[in-house]
């Protein structure tokens, strides 16, 4: 994790001070995410901006994440880099009942009683949610479009339909 980002952040003090933190986290430091990755090569670039909405009086942290996750393509079983760019505004709430009061554009983040948050956990939570169930590389070998139009040959067209006999019986 970056040297200028404390491991634990007091959410309410950060909101009052309108603090911003920019950091980097190696993928190897995110233990819950590792099971979804092919390997842990690379790092995640993120920023946290604590603030309060002046009109709605909602305390929030704006989370920005840029990373390329090494995933296994489910078509080719080859490693590929899945680009992830997240811009999420998390409304800070003290109690689950406060979630209903949040505007639609805010995602709720329940702050523990002591007010302390871990930046790594917030970033990792969003990355775990961003991993697709069945990742597919955008240009995986063998994933090219197949010609959907099938034109029958003349021989097939000339052959009598097996249903023609049924049609004749139906007319009788």
Name every feature range the model reports, one short phrase each.
Residues 1-18, 43-45, 81-172:
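Charge-rich, low-complexity linker and terminal segments
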Residues 77:
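Cys/His-coordinated zinc-binding microdomains
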Residues 1-70:
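A positional/architectural concept
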């Amino acid at each position: 994790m970056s040297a200028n980002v404390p491991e634990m952040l007091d959410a309410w003090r950060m909101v009052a001070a309108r603090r911003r933190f920019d950091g980097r986290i190696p993928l190897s430091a995110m233990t819950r995410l590792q099971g979804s990755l092919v390997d842990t090569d690379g790092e995640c670039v993120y920023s946290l901006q604590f603030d309060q909405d002046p009109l709605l009086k909602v305390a929030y942290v704006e989370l920005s994440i840029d990373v390329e996750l090494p995933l296994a393509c489910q078509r080719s079983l080859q490693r590929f880099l899945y680009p992830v760019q997240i811009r999420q505004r998390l409304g800070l709430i003290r109690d689950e009942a406060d979630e209903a009061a949040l505007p639609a554009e805010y995602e709720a983040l329940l702050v523990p009683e002591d007010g302390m948050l871990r930046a790594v956990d917030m970033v990792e939570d969003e990355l775990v949610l961003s991993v697709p169930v069945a990742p597919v590389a955008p240009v995986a070998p063998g994933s090219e479009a197949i010609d959907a139009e099938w034109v029958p040959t003349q021989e097939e067209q000339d052959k009598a339909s097996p249903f023609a006999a049924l049609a004749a019986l139906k007319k009788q």
